[in-house]
Amino acid sequence: MKSHGLINDSIGDMLTRIRNACLAKKSSVSIPFTRLNQNIAQILEQEGFIQTYQVSLDSQDLTIRLKYRSKKIYRGKKKESCITNLKRISKPGLRIYSNHKDILRILGGTGIVIVSTPEGLMTDREARLRGIGGELLCSVW
């Protein structure tokens, strides 16, 4: 059994691990399992930012398989992450809430904001469509 220590902000930790793994061109990244992290991974998969995710048998870890696209450059190909940026919006010390009308749009809708609503986690598009607001957890593009 691995000890992950005390993590005050599991979402911030998850985003940092994904960001660092993308910069290092890793194929996958392991994250401490929480239901919230699993729900975020599910949205990232649905929106095409990651290939897939998997929960370990002992439910201690969440493994995310990262997604890259090939970018042709002079003499060869370069792996480019499907995730350009991950940014934490609401933080443990400063929570950010919004009603459905005021949820910010990321890059004219090409990026997403993950919103924690009374009906669960969803993208900003889905929250606007359903007419519900909530806590703005993070943006991804």
From Swiss-Prot:
Which Gene3D superfamilies does its entry note?
A: 3.30.1370.30, 3.30.1490.10
Q: Which Pfam families does the annotation name?
A: Ribosomal_S8
User: Mind telling me what this protein is named?
Assistant: Small ribosomal subunit protein uS8c
- List, in alphabetical order, the Gene Ontology terms for molecular function in this entry: rRNA binding; structural constituent of ribosome
Organism of origin is Chlamydomonas reinhardtii
Which keywords does UniProt give here? Chloroplast, Plastid, Ribonucleoprotein, Ribosomal protein, RNA-binding, rRNA-binding
A GO cellular component term found in this entry reads: chloroplast
Q: Which family does it belong to?
A: Belongs to the universal ribosomal protein uS8 family.
Give compartment(s). Answer: Plastid, Chloroplast
> Looking at the keywords, is Plastid present?
yes
What coarse category fits the chief subcellular location reported for this protein? plastid
Gene Ontology terms: biological process? translation
Entry-linked InterPro entries:
Ribosomal_uS8, Ribosomal_uS8_CS, Ribosomal_uS8_sf
Keyword Translocase in record? no
Quaternary context: Part of the 30S ribosomal subunit.
What's this chain's function?
One of the primary rRNA binding proteins, it binds directly to 16S rRNA central domain where it helps coordinate assembly of the platform of the 30S subunit.
